[in-house]
């Protein structure tokens, strides 16, 4: 089942950026693409294709990607992202996101990481859909950009797939990573109710720069099985407020153990 984020992303992009084109020309082109008498991906490679033909080509590509999200078409579409016009690229990103086409992860991540790209936000949102666990560190690294922070937070809450939880734990535990990236992961973990990161929080809370965010998250995510790690954290921290908060949390969890 397609995720809500993918559908909302695709819908918002399509609503905002679909050009007004000649309906008859669009319908005729789409019919040709669907019959196979013309190839939509080839039409998208042509710089002189009309707006109606390009839009029909995008819609045909989107349908094919949804039907076959692991087909070679994914690579062809991904290769176009950096060379086609911005509006077409946005529509193609939405198509890749809707199809959860993981084969496009590298190209989408590259766009999301490009500071001067007008595609940064749509690429970051698409990355949450296509990248799975691989998207987590890339998205977290973008959190330091205030212009992207809110979108990145939403994407981190929604990203799904095998290994995502482990990627959150690894990112929170990485003492060499930027504090903004680790804090973004912590906030998203709370949004996901990801209780399995509590152990990593108990370690990270010993770092002064991480203390407050970890403290707030532990109050929401810690459970009785984390008591040993919480006691260790309480002994290690020197901030009186945090030490007191952990002490109260420990007593609360001991009472329900």
Please report, for each region that a protein language model flagged, where it lies by residue.
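Boundary at the C-terminal end of the N-terminal hydrophobic targeting segment
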Residues: 13-17
């Amino acid at each position: 089942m397609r995720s809500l984020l993918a559908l909302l992303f695709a819908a918002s992009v399509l609503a905002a950026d679909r050009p007004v084109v000649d309906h008859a020309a669009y319908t005729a082109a789409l019919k040709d693409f669907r019959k196979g008498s013309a190839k939509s991906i080839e039409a998208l490679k042509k710089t002189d294709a009309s707006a109606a033909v390009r839009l029909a080509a995008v819609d045909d590509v989107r349908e094919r990607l949804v039907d076959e999200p692991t087909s070679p078409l994914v690579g062809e579409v991904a290769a176009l992202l950096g060379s086609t016009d911005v509006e077409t690229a946005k529509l193609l990103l939405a198509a890749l996101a809707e199809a959860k086409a993981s084969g496009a992860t590298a190209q989408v991540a590259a766009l999301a990481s490009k500071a001067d790209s007008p595609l940064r936000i749509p690429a970051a949102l698409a990355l949450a859909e296509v990248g799975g666990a691989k998207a987590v560190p890339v998205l977290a690294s973008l959190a330091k950009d205030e212009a992207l922070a809110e979108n990145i937070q939403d994407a981190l809450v929604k990203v799904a797939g095998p290994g995502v939880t482990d990627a959150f734990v690894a990112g929170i535990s990485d003492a060499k990573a930027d504090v903004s990236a680790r804090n973004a992961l912590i906030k998203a973990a709370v949004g996901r109710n990801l209780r399995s990161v509590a152990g990593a929080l108990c370690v990270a809370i010993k770092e002064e720069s991480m203390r407050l965010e970890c403290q707030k998250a532990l109050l929401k995510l810690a459970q009785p099985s984390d008591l040993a790690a919480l006691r260790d954290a309480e002994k290690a921290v020197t901030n009186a407020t945090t030490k007191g908060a952990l002490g109260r949390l420990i007593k609360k969890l001991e009472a329900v153990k």
